[in-house]
Amino acid sequence: MIRRPPRSTPKPSSAASDVYKRQCMGRSHGIHAEPITFGLKLASFYAEFKRNRKRLIDAIDEVSTCAISGAVGTFANINPNVEKHVAKKLGLKAEPISTQVIPRDRHAFYFSVLGIIAGSVERVATEIRHLQRTEVYELQEFFSKKQKGSSAMPHKKNPILSENLTGLSRMVRSTVIPALENIALWHERDISHSSVERNIGPDANITIDFALVRLTNILDNMIVYPKKMLENLNITKGLIFSQELMLELTKTGLTREKSYRIVQSFSKKCFAENLNLFDVVQSDSYIMSKISIKKLKSIFSYSKHMKNVNFIFRRVIR
């Protein structure tokens, strides 16, 4: 998992490409919030998997110990140098203090890291699934000419690979609790952990490895729709600039609460009557007595949301 070279991570050169800088809608609670870029979404995933790689390296180091210390860890019938020699030959560290077995907190940490990685895989998969929904459709998994999306409905293109990753992630995470429960062995050892590890050891490692390969292939072949991203940005007709408008009103001397209520009333009017927020504000004499038309146009500009994108990229990818 660590040695396989990553193929689908944003690089500085990629950050400069059009699709990575493409503006799209940022969402919180599933609702339109404020504009971001598609590249920032990917950079967020990149940073998370970079942390995961470090976690996995640390977890492998944590679990890479050797114990040949006798029935209860006292070296009663074996020289400690044997343990040291074997550990060196195997590229392991001698366990500082063992019982009949290596303490299982080490293994619990390793499986917990696999669970975290699975959560990250699912986060990307879930984002793809949401963005491929018909109502959003800003991207989709690759769909070959002869592929079938549904046996009953020929028009469908389902995100089946991302759905599969969601299920696989659940399977990997299901191994974490048993690994944690293996820590509490009786006295200097019982065998309750053995049957668990014989199952979760192969299953968790093989599954997360497969999931990472599948995720890489999805990202390598993903189809992005920039025009749909732009279309979705304009769905709410300027409501996404409500925060800037509210903050600008507070600068004119209004309280934040009053500014909030004013902008909220405008927003409700826009929703109810399918109006553009800019037009509603521009037609309000009270607001226009406090904000110039030039300032109003700057409030409804995407530039403020994009001005620090390169800064964020430089901070993430270095």
Predicted segments with their positions:
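Single conserved hydrophobic/aromatic residue that forms the stacking wall/gate
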Residues: M1-A16, Y20
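Conserved acidic
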Residues: R4, S8, E34, K41, ...
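Histidine-centered active-site/metal-ligand motif
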Residues: P5-T9, H29, Y260
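N-terminal alpha-helical segment
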Residues: P12, R106, S144-K145, F241-L245, ...
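Short, flexible active-site-proximal loops enriched in glycine and acidic residues
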Residues: S17-H29, I97
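Helix-loop segments that flank and shape redox-cofactor active sites
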Residues: G26-P35, H193
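Internal glycine-rich alpha/beta core junctions
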Residues: E34-L185
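Glycine-rich cofactor/substrate-binding loops
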Residues: M153-R318
